């Protein structure tokens, strides 16, 4: 007898199955037990039966996919999660667009070395459909199966799984970490550990692909400022809560992949033969909110090592021959702190959770380190014989033909997409471009004039650096502007992408505040420019000359500049011609493919007339038509292969050639700007100083009453101002030489881009040649049945 006068309709079934009753009465938020007994409409095992305590209008429930997508955003996970995602993405095909396929998930599960049951449970949470498909065969291996069984189970568990984005992959890594720590894999457990996520151990997955960001930087940077040796600072005590978190936090993947975190810019081979071992440093989460700045530096390994910048430590400056300088240039006038250092500090604080990719430094330039920070990106660290992994220009880092290069580092890739609709009134319409960065998690809309403004600001602030090129606004022929057709707009879009990628991969320009704001400010740039205070001062303004910097520059530097300029000018012309020839080759390949299609149509049409043509004897006509149809089919296949190859050339080797061409032309333009801007009037000032000194001696020789009041002071003040101007101009010329030298060292790595593009193109030629040869071999087999009349 019920309280309301009647019994529930399923009372009998509940009495027969008390376990089912217990399960149905349970109502929790993250109930992941017995997923097969849940209703398909419930999100977290909510009761299917109505309750008198239900709200009149229940809120709209989200699907499991939406929950997993929003459970662990990129800003809330450790940096090891981000590195693992990037490592798996590098092994994927280029067509994944930053997502991980089922094959990548299978490799991740295999690297975790979990049992088949644990893998099936994790896949049941990430993708219930795949778990049900593999649950029957995955339970018999046990948790202690061998590596082969683990790989097979991982591959089986990933069957039927769709592509995973960064957020879904974060949940997968958290579930793997929970299982490895002995906890139950569930979304409930992931949500409870949101602030202290487990660190999964994926042996062989990250170490084989992740290399130091910028190996070998001692040869590539200016020497740091020479200062007296100061005793190392005592480490800042961490708060008790932070210390406890560091004690219980498992080691991150960065510690595994970087053997020497105190020297992150150098390869491990540099430290072979040294009598020191790797220091222990703890790393924190990428997006920790309550960690003080000093503690964050300790977590990143930046404050653990004290770098001495004394003259004794600078080994190269003492070995170089001395340089005679004027007495005016040996003394330094008092000046305030370096404005470049202040700008870099503001950039460092505004980088957000990512802390700038591929590396952030609070130094002002290539060789200006900050206090207790790793010199970078061109500082005095590294060893000979190594190269910087950064590059000039931009291309898709995931593009790989044949195999994945394990030695290439992950580069930030800026995507530029043409918006479908134009903006503006008639006759004044313009295209908009969506600029997105997966690494920064930003997506903004910019127009072509915004790119022009950014480049103008960079020309004023960094006139002696390699500034990338912008594509033209319109194409002109004999002074007449041609129409902006779709092909030109597409070429301009690719040129804008190369421009931005060259900026963000430059060690100094990538940290410029204007560049960061250009990529991250979501509002219209013209509105932001009116509200923001923008400084476009020269980067050398207010910067003092460090002791020993001038002596560290070799005396043959000008000869090196002149020789490099001649080679760059000739190479730029040749690369411009090479890009034009490659463009013609692509057009011809497309034309040959179209001719194959026309020939296929003609052969198929011949089959319609064969019966009438050979009406005398119809016996061999069917075999003849079969051969013609097979010929047409394989010609169509050849057409498709040729079109695909032409498209691959256009998106691959042609873009790589243009990237190299832009780097050479940018360097050529930098030398031209130096001829215009690196000028001084030091000889004139020296002659005026000599004149004023002679005048001052004459005034001193006169009696007191014969000298006008204040005349001596005016002459002395003029001499002091001229000497200070000489010192400033001389220091600027030294900074310019140092800057150009560092730019040449950074540009030196473009030779490796040439090696990669030629190897990739050769692999593409081999791949498509083999596919075409296989197509013709199959055609030959199909033509064996044609009548020969023998």
From Swiss-Prot:
Lipid bilayer topology: Peripheral membrane protein
GO molecular function: phosphatidylinositol-3-phosphate binding
SMART domains: PX (SM00312)
Ligase is among the record's keywords: no
Residues the record lists as binding a 1,2-diacyl-sn-glycero-3-phospho-(1D-myo-inositol-3-phosphate): 447, 449, 473, 492
Notes on the domains: The PX domain binds phosphatidylinositol 3-phosphate which is necessary for peripheral membrane localization.
Keyword Cytoplasm belongs to the record: yes
Purpose of the protein: Required for vacuolar protein sorting.
Keywords noted in UniProt: Cytoplasm, Membrane, Protein transport, Transport
Identification of the protein by name: Sorting nexin mvp1
Species assigned in the record: Neurospora crassa (strain ATCC 24698 / 74-OR23-1A / CBS 708.71 / DSM 1257 / FGSC 987)
PROSITE patterns: PX
Skewed-composition ranges (Low complexity): 241-252, 324-339, 386-400
A Pfam family per the record: PX
Sequence segments annotated as region (Disordered): 1-62, 215-342, 373-406
Biased composition (Polar residues): 1-10, 20-40, 297-319
Regions of compositional bias (Basic and acidic residues) in chain numbering: 269-283
Biased composition regions of type Pro residues, renumbered to the chain: 225-240
Subcellular location: Cytoplasm; Membrane
One Gene Ontology cellular component: membrane
Residue ranges constituting the PX domain according to the UniProt record: 411-525
Family: Belongs to the sorting nexin family.
Gene field: vsp-1
InterPro entries (alphabetical): AH/BAR_dom_sf, PX_dom, PX_dom_sf, SNX8/Mvp1, SNX8/Mvp1_PX, Snx8_BAR_dom
């Amino acid at each position: 007898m019920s309280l309301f006068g009647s019994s529930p309709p399923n009372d009998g079934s509940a009495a027969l199955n008390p376990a089912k009753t217990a399960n149905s009465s349970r109502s929790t938020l993250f109930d992941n037990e017995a997923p097969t007994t849940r209703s398909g409409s419930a999100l977290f095992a909510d009761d299917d039966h109505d309750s008198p305590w239900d709200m009149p209008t229940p809120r709209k429930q989200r699907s499991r996919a939406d929950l997993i997508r929003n459970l662990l955003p990129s800003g809330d996970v450790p940096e090891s999660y981000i590195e693992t995602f990037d490592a798996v993405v590098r092994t994927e095909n280029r067509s994944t667009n930053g997502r991980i396929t089922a094959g990548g998930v299978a490799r991740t599960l295999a690297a975790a070395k979990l049992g088949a049951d644990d893998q099936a449970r994790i896949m049941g949470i990430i993708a219930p459909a795949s778990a049900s498909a593999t649950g029957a065969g995955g339970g018999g291996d046990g948790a202690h199966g061998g590596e082969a069984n683990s790989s097979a189970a991982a591959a089986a568990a990933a069957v039927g799984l769709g592509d995973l984005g960064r957020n879904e992959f974060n949940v997968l890594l958290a579930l793997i970490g929970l299982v490895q720590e002995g906890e139950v894999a569930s979304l409930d457990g992931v949500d409870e550990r949101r602030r202290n996520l487990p660190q999964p151990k994926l042996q062989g997955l990250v170490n084989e692909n992740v290399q130091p960001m910028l190996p070998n930087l001692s040869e590539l940077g200016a020497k740091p400022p020479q200062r007296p040796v100061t005793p190392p600072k005592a480490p800042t005590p961490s708060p008790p809560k932070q210390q406890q978190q560091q004690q219980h936090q498992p080691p991150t993947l960065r510690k595994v992949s970087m053997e020497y975190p105190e020297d992150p810019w150098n390869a491990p081979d540099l430290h072979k033969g040294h009598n020191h071992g790797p220091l222990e440093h703890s790393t924190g989460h990428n997006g920790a909110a309550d960690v003080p700045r000093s503690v964050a530096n300790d977590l990143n390994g930046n404050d653990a090592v004290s770098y001495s910048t004394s003259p004794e430590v600078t080994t190269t400056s003492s070995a170089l021959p001395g340089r005679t300088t004027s007495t005016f240039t040996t003394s330094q006038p008092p000046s305030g702190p370096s404005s470049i250092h202040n700008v870099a500090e503001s950039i460092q604080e505004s980088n957000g959770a990512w802390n700038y990719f591929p590396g952030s430094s609070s130094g002002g330039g290539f060789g200006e380190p900050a206090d207790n920070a790793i010199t970078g990106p061109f500082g005095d660290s590294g060893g000979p014989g190594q190269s910087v992994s950064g590059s000039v220009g931009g291309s898709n880092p995931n593009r790989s033909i044949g195999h994945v290069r394990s030695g290439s580092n992950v580069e930030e890739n800026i995507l530029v997409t043409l918006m479908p609709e134009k903006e503006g009134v008639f006759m004044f319409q313009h295209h908009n471009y969506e600029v997105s960065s997966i690494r920064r998690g930003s997506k903004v809309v910019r127009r072509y004039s915004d790119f022009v403004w950014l480049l103008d600001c960079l020309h004023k602030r960094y006139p002696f650096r390699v500034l990338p090129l912008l594509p033209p606004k319109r194409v002109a022929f004999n002074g007449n502007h041609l129409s902006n057709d779709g092909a030109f707009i597409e070429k301009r879009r690719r040129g804008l992408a190369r421009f931005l990628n060259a900026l963000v991969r430059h060690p100094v320009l990538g940290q410029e505040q204007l560049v960061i704001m250009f990529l991250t400010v979501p509002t219209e740039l013209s509105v932001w420019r009116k509200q923001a205070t923008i400084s476009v001062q020269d980067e050398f303004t207010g910067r003092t000359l460090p002791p020993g910097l001038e002596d560290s520059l070799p005396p043959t530097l000008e000869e090196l500049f002149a020789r490099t300029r001649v080679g760059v000018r000739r190479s730029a012309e040749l690369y411009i011609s090479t890009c034009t020839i490659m463009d013609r080759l692509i057009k011809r390949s497309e034309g040959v493919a179209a001719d194959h299609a026309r020939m296929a149509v003609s052969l198929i049409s011949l089959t319609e007339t064969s019966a009438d043509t050979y009406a005398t004897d119809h016996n061999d006509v069917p075999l003849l038509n079969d051969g013609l149809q097979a010929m047409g089919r394989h010609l169509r296949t050849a057409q498709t292969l040729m079109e695909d190859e032409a498209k691959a050339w256009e998106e691959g080797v042609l873009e790589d050639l243009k990237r190299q061409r832009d780097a050479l032309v940018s360097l050529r333009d930098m030398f031209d700007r130096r001829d215009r801007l690196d000028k001084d009037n030091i000889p004139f000032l020296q002659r005026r100083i000599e004149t004023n000194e002679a005048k001052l001696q004459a005034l001193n020789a006169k009696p007191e009453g014969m000298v006008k009041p204040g005349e001596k002071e005016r002459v002395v003040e003029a001499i002091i101002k001229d000497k200070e101007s000489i010192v400033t101009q001389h220091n600027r010329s030294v900074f310019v030489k140092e800057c150009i030298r560092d730019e040449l060292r950074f540009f030196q790595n473009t030779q490796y881009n040439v090696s990669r593009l030629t190897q990739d193109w050769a692999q593409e030629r081999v791949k498509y040649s083999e596919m075409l040869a296989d197509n013709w071999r199959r055609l030959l087999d199909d033509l064996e049945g044609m009548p020969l009349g023998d």
